[in-house]
Amino acid sequence: NGRYDGSSKYAKHDRWAFFPSASVGWRISEEKFFKSLSKVVDNLKIRASIGALGNQITDGNHSFMSIISGKVLTNYMMDGKIVNGLNIPTLPSMVTWEKVITKDIGLDWSLFKNRLFGSFDFYVRDTKDMVRSVTLPAVLGTSGGKENIADMRTVGWELEMTWKDRIQNVLGSPLDYSLTVGLSDYQAEITKYDNPNGSLASGMYHKGQKLGEIWGYVTDGYIQDDYEAAKMNYLQKFISSKWYPGDIRYKDLNGDGIIDKGKVTLDNPGDQKVIGNSTPRYRFNLQGGIGWHGFDIRAIFEGVMKRDLWTGSDVFWGFSRGIYNSNVTQYHIDNTWTYENPTAYYPRPNTDGNGRSRQVQTKYLQNAAYIRLKDITLSYNIPRKWLSKL
């Protein structure tokens, strides 16, 4: 099947797009050669699909046209007078549909008289012609619009299995129980981006970048005395001109004798590197239930097995930018660097905001993996014969 979509938000020649899809499945358990396994395998099906959808990414209803505004040109005089003129704040955004093409192959099964059943899917999702802002030379006199300049590929899988059964007699009544396990993972990578210089500046992407990458310094302990602090005044001068005992020391990864971000490019990232990734990995859920003699109890757990998190918030650091932004607890006080506590978790107390010791770094990168009890329900089903007496 397919769909043909149009949007008045795009220019006339980019307004329409066709998005087809197709799927196929094969129930192997229905084939004659499979009959010998039918006592164990109740159902086995493989399936595959491919399909495309469109994302409508625009700013406003007519972003493909420039908006011209009247403005007094205060920087120029003509014949001794300030003249009025027209200003084009940005170039038109000549964009069209983002296209999301998903390929999926899956397996459905049920075993042991439908007591064990589940499904597995592996997919590749290509997002083509992603809309991003274009950087233009400053000499142009206006900012660039948006264009379809990026592609991204997401590869992932999803697994779900359920065991559901009944024990016929437990203290005079049957006991029903079930357990469901779900697990999934994905990673997304930029496969095309208009970034010829490999800039690592905020908001920029580059080909080969894994979504969620965290760039930062590698922590190399604390500055422990005034002599070492004097050395860091030179080695780490691009971060701050003055260092003290209890401040963080960073590793010189490229061996050039100074700690800095280089040119903030892939070819010259200075002493920074990828130290983690904020993408949640290996999401899981557990659902269990027991029913007996009218009582039911159900519980749902969910979580993430792997995720890195850089928080950098005032709440995390405790001592922060002045008394009004600080949130100091006893934990912060007990775990802050002093001469008597040189291996503490936090650096010396200071109020320099995100300077010196608060650069993105390995030491304070948090493990954001978790498990939580999302829901638990206890219920009782009133017997019908009781209700009939009401």
Label each region the model flagged.
Residues N1-Y10, R15-E30, V100-T102, L111-G118, ...:
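Surface-exposed extracellular loop regions of Gram-negative outer-membrane beta-barrel proteins
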Residues S7, V304-L390:
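Extracytoplasmic gating/loop element in the C-terminal half of outer-membrane beta-barrel translocons
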Residues Y10-W16, S36-S38, A52-I67, M130-V134, ...:
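Outer-membrane beta-barrel and related beta-rich outer-membrane complex signature
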Residues S29-L44, F112-R115, R166-Y177, I190-N195, ...:
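Short loop/turn motifs that connect adjacent beta-strands in outer-membrane beta-barrel proteins
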Residues K35-K99, F117-M152, D194-L200:
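Solvent-exposed loop/turn elements at secondary-structure boundaries
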Residues A52, L73-F117, G145-G172, G208-W215, ...:
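Outer-membrane beta-barrel signature, preferentially recognizing the C-terminal barrel domain
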Residues H62, E147, R166-S278:
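Conserved small-residue
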Residues P92-T96, F122-I167, V218, Y250-K263, ...:
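Outer membrane beta-barrel strand-and-loop segments of large Gram-negative receptors
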